[in-house]
Design a protein with these regions (language model features):
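Membrane-interfacial, low-structure loops and terminal tails that flank and connect transmembrane helices
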Residues: 1-14, 79-89
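Serine-dependent acyl-ester chemistry module
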Residues: 13, 18, 25-51, 55, ...
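Cytosolic-side transmembrane helix boundary signature
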Residues: 60-95
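Transmembrane alpha-helices and immediately adjacent membrane-cytoplasm interface residues
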Residues: 92-116
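Membrane/wall-proximal cationic-aromatic binding patches
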Residues: 112-207, 350-354
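Generic structural signal for small/hydrophobic residues in well-ordered secondary structure
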Residues: 183, 222, 238-239, 308, ...
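Conserved SGNH/GDSL esterase-like catalytic core that processes O-acyl groups on lipids
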Residues: 187-262
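Short, amphipathic alpha-helical "lid/cap" segments that border enzyme active or binding sites
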Residues: 219, 223, 294, 298, ...
Length: 400
């Protein structure tokens, strides 16, 4: 006896097949569209993952998407249709369970106290504390210790929160001073105070340096930090700001205090926790977001130079390039700096000159960076204080 199909089973079956086919074709289309050029446009250079890592991940994901798409569209489509036709209620239950799981995950994450992506570990040395204007700063007047590459590193801070040799040797704001702003590279992550760029720069120039850098800062946070601290110094000689193309993505984040058009201060933006987690794992950027980041970064770097000149200090942007400059990094550098006619010194560093088990520059690399800055500042002084023209200095080894 032939089994008579249940009334209405044909429509759910066709709907299931169509859904599987559409999803499969979509996955195949995405796999074809996700080229290296697309990747370079929407995934910015990363300090922690070289481009070749991104490309390898992209290849694996494209192959997986294409294979899954073909399987859904041409192999599993009839099975999906039959499954939906036999148990349409189960498909609805699965969809409801998925929605409830997402909602529950979001609720759990919202119950946790989360920090911006650049400050996830509260007990990490050097210790940070919340700051309503800047997002976070270092805890002042203390010394902390960390083991980096098998070395015990001391991070000491004076009462102003600047990194110093010893807590009882604070920066003197009345002396001629070179102010250094930036993030962990300028700060000297994994380096002793003597090995850090600001300390070596001060020694080469014979002028006191002030290390105002803070871990995880973006370019606009650097500017806000300078804006708050520059008035405290009576005789600023130079302001050296660090810009790394591999860290440009930070300038696009808004989960911290940030600057909008016209350098307008904006509070942190709250996002869905799951969306923030997905963005951390898959840092996709829309083209419009990148364009806004380029414009904001140019405006901030100009403002840093203007504030420095107003106080009689020479502004200089240092651009350390660890390893060979990839095409994506070159595009960011040219768009942010060259097209805006901003003065900077490009310092190419051997990719091997990094800390063990860490991607931060080692003491040898810090020496090269400090030497390049010193040469440019001497050149500016010889020009009677006039700003040096836009160009780059490629230096691959310590000066002899």
């Amino acid at each position: 006896m032939t089994e008579v199909p249940r009334s209405g089973s044909g429509l759910p079956r066709r709907a299931g097949e169509i859904a599987a086919a559409v999803l499969g074709v979509t996955l195949i289309g995405c796999a074809l569209a996700a080229t290296e050029r697309w990747c370079d446009r929407h995934f910015l250079p990363s300090f922690f993952l070289p481009r070749r890592g991104y490309v390898l991940i992209l290849i694996v994901v494209r192959v997986a998407m294409a294979a899954l798409g073909v399987w859904l569209a041409f192999v599993a489509r009839p099975r999906v249709g039959r499954l939906v036709a036999r148990t349409p209620a189960r498909a609805v239950h699965i969809a409801i369970a998925g929605v409830l799981a997402i909602g529950a995950s979001e609720a759990v994450l919202r119950s946790m106290r989360l920090r911006p992506a650049e400050w996830l570990m509260p007990d990490e040395e050097p210790r940070r504390q919340p700051d309503a204007q800047l997002g976070w700063t270092f805890v002042p007047a203390r010394a902390g210790h960390a083991d980096v590459g098998g070395r015990a590193i001391e991070y000491a801070f004076d009462s102003a929160g600047y990194r110093v040799r010893r807590v009882d040797e604070p920066v003197d704001p009345d002396r001629p001073t070179i102010l250094c702003i930036g993030e962990s590279v300028m700060f000297g992550e994994g380096l002793t105070w003597e090995e850090s760029v600001p300390a070596q720069l001060g020694g080469m120039m014979g002028i006191q340096s002030a290390n105002l850098a803070v871990h995880g800062y973006s370019t606009d946070q650097e500017y806000l930090r300078l804006q708050a601290e520059l008035p405290h110094f009576r005789r600023p000689v130079a302001v050296v700001s660090l810009f790394m193309t591999a860290l440009f993505g930070r300038n696009l984040d808004d989960d911290r205090p940030h600057l909008g058009p016209g350098l307008r201060w904006l509070p942190p933006q709250s996002h869905a926790r799951l969306a923030s987690l997905a963005k951390l794992l898959v840092p996709y950027r829309r083209s419009e977001t990148v364009e806004r980041g380029v414009a904001m970064t140019r405006e901030v770097l100009r403002a840093i130079a203007d504030r420095s000149r107003e106080r009689g200090a020479t502004p200089l942007i240092v651009v350390p390039q660890l390893g060979r400059e990839e095409a994506g990094e070159r595009i960011v550098r040219r768009r942010v700096l060259d097209e805006a006619q901003l003065p900077y010194v490009l310092v190419e560093i051997d990719d091997a000159w990094r800390l063990p088990w860490d991607r931060h520059p080692n003491a040898r690399a810090a020496h090269v960076i400090a030497a390049a800055i010193t040469a440019r500042l001497h050149s500016a002084a010889d020009a009677r204080g006039q700003t040096a023209p836009v160009s780059s200095m490629r230096q691959k080894g310590p000066p002899r």
